[in-house]
């Protein structure tokens, strides 16, 4: 699926399970169970040990299914590239990282850039992010989003 197809799929499905586990083996089982349970998009966070191996294994096992595997908590371009090469179809960052946006664009993958201030949101957009994820939004609530 190309980048526009991935974006449309994410927008159409509107459900992403963010998964974490205490080990890579557990993580693979969680990803498979979530996908087999009908969740169309699964985000594997880089905070879990063995996340890259999990992405690679899950991407191969679920190839051809409706499940879309992405990666979250991406902090640098090297991790972004490694995750894409392992099979991640989309990238999520908790912070604004211009090198991550550039790497995702180089590989034709959608990127959700973490941003908090209006300046960060605009900077992410101008750098080519596909989505700005206001993070951490829970500390300011919906009125902040409305004001922006």
Q: Where do the model's predicted regions map?
A:
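Conserved anion-binding
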Residues: 50, 65-66, 75-78, 84-148
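Conserved N-terminal beta1-alpha1 strand-loop-helix module at the mouth
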Residues: 1-86, 106
């Amino acid at each position: 699926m190309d980048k526009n197809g991935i974006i449309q799929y994410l927008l159409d499905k509107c459900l992403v399970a963010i998964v974490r586990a205490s080990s890579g083996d557990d993580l693979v089982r969680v990803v498979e169970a979530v996908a087999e349970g009908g969740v169309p998009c699964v985000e594997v966070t880089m905070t879990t040990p063995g996340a890259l191996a999990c992405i690679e294994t899950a991407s191969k096992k679920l190839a051809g299914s409706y499940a879309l595997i992405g990666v979250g908590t991406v902090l640098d371009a090297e991790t972004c590239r490694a995750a894409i090469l392992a099979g991640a179809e989309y990238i999520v960052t908790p912070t604004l990282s211009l090198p991550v946006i550039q790497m995702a664009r180089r590989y034709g993958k959608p990127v959700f850039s973490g941003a908090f201030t209006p300046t960060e949101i605009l900077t992410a957009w101008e750098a080519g992010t596909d989505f700005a994820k206001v993070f951490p939004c829970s500390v300011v609530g919906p009125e902040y989003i409305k004001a922006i």
